[in-house]
């Protein structure tokens, strides 16, 4: 399925409108949230999570989704408040700590003064390390795949934050651990988009520029890759490349990613309700096909 078909396929707003909020299970709210986050409907995803929490007040995963959606929508400070409450309540889940760390990373990025940058970088690293420490790399040599799948994300972000904060040695040490985790997962038959771009980022941090660019390029061509995922990956890759202060490295990383465009649509209703039909309904599917062809 193409990225365009994935984006246009579900009518998420209609699905949300039709959801029976009084009878819906927490799982139904979560599934809808996931769909919306996947295609970049972050504010709508937050609305769904909030509605779900009104009915399922203690649901940890719905709280996680609400915070995740807020972060993605550009409100990381509000997200930290939700997640810090979960942690204060005894939540030691890897996902909670990873999301909290990610929100602090966003605050680090948005901060303009040095003091705030240092503060949020330290908070982000501490939370990523908390997530990673639930099953440290040293104890994962004989670990099952499920454990490994929770570790590559905090590990690569520890590497990223150290590297961007100027501690290149610590950054590369964690990058090598992340690369090894990805290798283990690949050997076990698990190698999705996020694992592949994590491997690419580790290679970039370690200075293997050609291999990193090749791995990024391969990941963006995967059938399941989403434009929002590629944009996020590209942004972080360019941040790392800029640290090297070498235009050739930056150019190499830029060329590894496709150019993502923005489509703006405008128009008016051809045939108003109750008026005689002027546009033949049988032509609608052909027009849709032509538009999709042009966008692809």
Where do the protein language model's features map onto the residues?
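Internal alpha-helical scaffold/solenoid segments in large eukaryotic proteins
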Residues: 39-52, 60-83, 125-129, 147-161, ...
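Alpha-helical linker/edge segments of TPR/alpha-solenoid repeat scaffolds
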Residues: 73-79, 107-114, 160-173, 201, ...
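Structured C-terminal portions of repeat-based eukaryotic scaffold domains
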Residues: 174-180, 184-198, 202-205
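TPR/TPR-like (Sel1-like) alpha-helical repeat modules
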Residues: 163, 176-180, 209-227, 255-258
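A conserved position within tetratricopeptide repeats
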Residues: 16-20, 46, 50-54, 80, ...
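Helix-turn-helix repeat elements of alpha-solenoid scaffolds
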Residues: 2-13, 34-47, 68-84, 116-129, ...
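Eukaryotic intrinsically disordered, low-complexity segments enriched for acidic and Ser/Thr/Pro residues
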Residues: 41, 246, 251, 257-293
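Amphipathic alpha-helical repeat scaffolds of TPR domains
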Residues: 1-35, 55-72, 91-112, 136-138, ...
């Amino acid at each position: 399925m193409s990225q365009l078909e994935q984006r246009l396929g579900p009518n998420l707003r209609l699905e949300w409108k039709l959801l029976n909020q009084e009878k819906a299970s927490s799982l139904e709210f979560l599934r809808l949230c996931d769909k919306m986050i996947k295609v970049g409907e972050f504010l709508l995803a937050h609305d769904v999570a909030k509605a779900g929490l009104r009915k399922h007040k203690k649901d940890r995963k719905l709280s996680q989704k609400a915070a995740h959606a807020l972060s993605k929508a550009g409100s990381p400070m509000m997200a930290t408040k939700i997640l810090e409450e979960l942690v204060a309540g005894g939540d030691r889940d890897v996902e909670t700590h990873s999301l909290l760390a990610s929100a602090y990373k966003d605050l680090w990025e948005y901060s303009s003064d040095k003091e705030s940058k240092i503060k949020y970088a330290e908070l982000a690293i501490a939370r990523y390390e908390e997530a990673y420490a639930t099953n440290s790399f040293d104890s994962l040599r004989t670990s099952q795949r499920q454990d490994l799948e929770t570790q590559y994300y905090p590990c690569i972000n520890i590497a990223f934050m150290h590297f961007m904060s100027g501690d290149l040695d610590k950054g590369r040490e964690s990058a090598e651990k992340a690369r090894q985790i990805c290798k283990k997962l690949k050997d076990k038959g698990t190698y999705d988009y996020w694992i592949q771009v994590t491997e690419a980022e580790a290679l970039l941090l370690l200075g293997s520029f050609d291999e990193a660019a090749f791995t990024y390029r391969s990941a963006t061509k995967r059938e399941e890759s989403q434009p929002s995922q590629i944009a996020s990956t590209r942004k972080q890759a360019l941040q790392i490349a800029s640290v090297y202060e070498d235009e050739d490295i930056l150019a190499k990383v830029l060329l590894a990613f496709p150019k993502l465009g923005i489509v703006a649509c405008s128009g008016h209703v051809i045939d108003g309700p109750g008026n005689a039909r002027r546009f033949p309904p049988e032509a609608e599917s052909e027009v849709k096909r032509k538009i999709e062809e042009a966008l692809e």
